[in-house]
Amino acid sequence: MSEQMNEDALVDSKKFVSRRGGFEINANPEIVPPVQRTRVRVEKSADGFAHEPLAKKYGSAEARTKIGEMVKAFIPGTTTTPLLVQKKPDGMSLVHVWFGANFPLFRHSHPKFGDCLYYVVAGEILMGNQTLRAGSTFFVPNGQPYKYTAGPAGVELLEFRAGGGVVDAPGMKLDETSFESMDRIIAGSYANDADWQVPERIGDTALRQADFDGRLSKI
């Protein structure tokens, strides 16, 4: 009975098509494993970042090397899992992002991809003088630089986009302005990497946060 109802629902959904696409399901996705440091090619890492101000300030080769060092330092503490990607104009995207304990996210922006709404699923982040815990949201207008630090249990976020970016703009723009600030990110990454434990399932960071808060025995 329920199987027939599901088939009927799928058939019926074909009548309703948005300019962004048709009915779509991505069921029970697994978290993409983090990249390990041994796989990082330091000399190539800078290719993924627009970084003209740093290159102008320090020289191209020096800037590329520093970016590579930063990427190698932080890479095992984060992972991105696509949940929905619509490639049509103004298509929506939904991405799950995890950062490990006390992960120092670098200042950056995504001018190519449009406005972005973030939802904290589990754990917490420190943004400026605010602590954003599960259920919190923040909206980043297209091209605005931002950074934050993950809390002591790490953090999981959902990243919502609905198009509207600048086609020829960089997908990832590094907005750190000095090697000193990047060195702090590098040092912070190596200082905390022993506590970077990627969750097995989306939302599992909530258990680590509850344990850290002393609430686990009450759950």
Q: Where are these predicted regions, by residue range?
A:
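A short, N-terminal "cap"/entry segment at the start of jelly-roll beta-barrel domains
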Residues: S2-G91, A187-G188, D193-I219
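Ligand-binding loop in jelly-roll beta-barrel domains
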Residues: D90, T131-A134, N142-M172
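Glycosyltransferase-associated regions of secretory-pathway enzymes
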Residues: S2-E3, G171, S178-S181
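Surface-exposed beta-loop interaction hotspot
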Residues: D175-N192
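Alpha/beta-hydrolase fold active-site loops
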Residues: D115
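Conserved short histidine dyad/triad with adjacent acidic residue
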Residues: R64-K66, K72-P111, L126, T131, ...
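Glycine-centered positions in the ABC transporter ATPase nucleotide-binding domain
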Residues: A122-G123
